[in-house]
C-alpha cells in the first residue's frame, strides 16, 4: 500500500482514538450537541479504524512468517502462513481503499421517491403500484418511515404517479441507484389472449435538503393553486381546498401535495419537494456537461435511462447497467432489494477507484 495512504489511515486511526477519549469526558457528555456530533464522527471512523488495525496485524504476521522461512523445520508452515496472510492483506487493502473513497454528503439523508407510470396505460399504472409496494417493503425491512405526499391513482388500481418521503438511516445512499427507467414484461390481468405486454415506469430519487441548502426560489417565480384532495382519506376528502399545486415557472417543474388537511403543511412539503427537484435538475445538467467517456451508473430519473427489466413469465429481473440477471423476481417484488443494490454499489465504487487511480 502507498505510504501516502498509510499516513492518511494512521491519522484517521489517531482521530478515532481521540474521539473515543472525548466521548468519555464529562464536559463532552454535558454538551449534548457536541456529544451527538462526536458520536456521529466516531461511528464514521470505526470501520476504517477496525480495518486498519486488522491490516497492521496482518503486516506483522507477514514479517514473522518471512523470518521463519530461514528455519528449515518451520519453512513449510511459514510458507502457508505467508500465503494466507498476503491474501488477507490484499482483501483488507481493497476494503480500506473503498472506505477512503470520498463520501457523498447526501447519502445519509432522507429521500423523496417518485414513481410514474410511463408507456403501457393501465398496466403501467399497476406496475407503478407494484414498484411502490416493493420500495415500501424494502423500507419496512430497514425500519424506515414512508409518508405518501401525493398520489394520482390509476383507473384500475396502482398509480399514474406517486411521490413519497422515505425517512431513516442512509436512505438516499441505498436508493439513489433506483433513478431511471424500469420495464415490466408480463401478461396483464385484462389480456384475454395471454399475450405478454411490455410497460414502463420511471423512478426518480432525490435527497431531502436541509433548509440551509435549499436553492434560492423567488416567490414571484411560483404559481400556487389550491384544489380539493382526492383519493383515499375518508370523510375529510373533498371538503376543503387543502391540496396544493406549485408550478416553478422558469423550469416548468410542477409539484403537488395533498397529504395533510392543513394547506400550510401541504405547501411546506411541496416546497421541500420542489427544492429537491430543482437541485436534482441542476446536478443532472452538470453531470451532462461533465459527461466523460466513463459510464454514469447514477440515473437521472429519465425514461431513457434503462435500469431494469422485470420479466414475470420467466421470473427474471435484469439490471442492464451491470449486466446482472437474477431468477428471483418474487423475492425482488417483496422488497428484497439488497441482492440488486449491493452489486451496483460495488460496481460504482470500482468505477470511483478507477477514476482515482487515473488521477494519480
UniProtKB/Swiss-Prot annotation:
GO terms for cellular component: cytoplasm. One of its GO terms (molecular function) is translation release factor activity, codon specific. The gene is prfA. InterPro entries: PCRF (IPR005139), Pep_chain_release_fac_I (IPR000352), Pep_chain_release_fac_I_sf (IPR045853), Prokaryotic/Mito_RF (IPR050057), RF-1 (IPR004373). Disulfide bonds: none annotated. It comes from Klebsiella pneumoniae (strain 342). Pfam families: PCRF, RF-1. Peptide chain release factor 1 directs the termination of translation in response to the peptide chain termination codons UAG and UAA. This is Peptide chain release factor 1.
Amino acid at each position: 500500500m502507498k505510504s501516502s495512504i498509510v499516513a492518511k489511515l494512521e491519522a484517521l486511526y489517531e482521530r478515532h482514538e481521540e474521539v473515543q477519549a472525548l466521548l468519555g469526558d464529562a464536559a463532552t457528555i454535558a454538551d449534548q450537541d457536541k456529544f451527538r456530533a462526536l458520536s456521529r464522527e466516531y461511528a464514521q471512523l470505526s470501520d476504517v479504524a477496525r480495518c486498519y488495525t486488522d491490516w497492521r496485524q496482518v503486516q506483522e504476521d507477514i514479517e514473522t512468517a518471512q523470518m521463519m522461512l530461514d528455519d528449515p523445520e518451520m519453512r513449510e508452515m511459514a510458507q502457508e502462513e505467508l500465503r494466507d496472510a498476503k491474501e488477507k492483506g490484499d482483501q483488507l487493502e481493497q476494503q480500506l481503499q473503498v472506505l477512503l473513497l470520498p463520501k457523498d454528503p447526501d447519502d445519509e439523508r432522507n429521500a423523496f421517491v417518485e414513481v410514474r407510470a410511463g408507456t403501457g396505460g393501465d398496466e403501467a399504472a399497476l406496475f407503478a403500484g407494484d414498484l411502490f409496494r416493493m420500495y415500501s417493503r424494502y423500507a419496512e425491512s430497514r425500519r424506515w418511515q414512508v409518508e405518501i405526499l401525493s398520489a394520482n391513482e390509476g383507473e384500475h388500481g396502482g398509480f399514474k404517479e406517486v411521490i413519497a418521503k422515505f425517512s431513516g438511516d442512509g436512505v438516499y445512499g441505498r436508493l439513489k441507484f433506483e433513478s431511471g427507467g424500469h420495464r415490466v414484461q408480463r401478461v396483464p390481468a385484462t389480456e384475454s389472449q395471454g399475450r405478454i405486454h411490455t410497460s414502463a415506469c420511471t423512478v426518480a430519487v432525490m435527497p431531502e435538503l436541509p433548509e440551509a441548502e435549499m436553492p434560492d426560489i423567488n416567490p414571484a417565480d411560483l404559481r400556487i393553486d389550491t384544489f380539493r384532495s382526492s383519493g383515499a382519506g375518508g370523510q375529510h376528502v373533498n371538503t376543503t381546498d387543502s391540496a396544493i399545486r406549485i408550478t416553478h415557472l422558469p423550469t416548468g417543474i410542477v409539484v403537488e401535495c395533498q397529504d395533510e388537511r392543513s394547506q400550510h403543511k401541504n405547501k411546506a412539503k411541496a416546497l421541500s419537494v420542489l427544492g429537491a427537484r430543482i437541485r436534482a435538475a441542476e446536478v443532472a445538467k452538470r453531470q451532462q456537461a461533465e459527461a466523460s467517456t466513463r459510464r454514469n451508473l447514477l440515473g437521472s430519473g429519465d425514461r431513457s435511462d434503462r435500469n431494469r427489466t422485470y420479466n414475470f413469465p420467466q421470473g427474471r429481473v435484469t439490471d442492464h447497467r451491470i449486466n446482472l440477471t437474477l431468477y428471483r423476481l418474487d423475492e425482488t417484488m417483496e422488497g428484497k432489494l439488497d441482492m440488486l443494490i449491493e452489486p451496483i454499489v460495488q460496481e460504482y465504487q470500482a468505477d470511483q477507484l478507477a477514476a482515482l487511480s487515473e488521477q494519480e
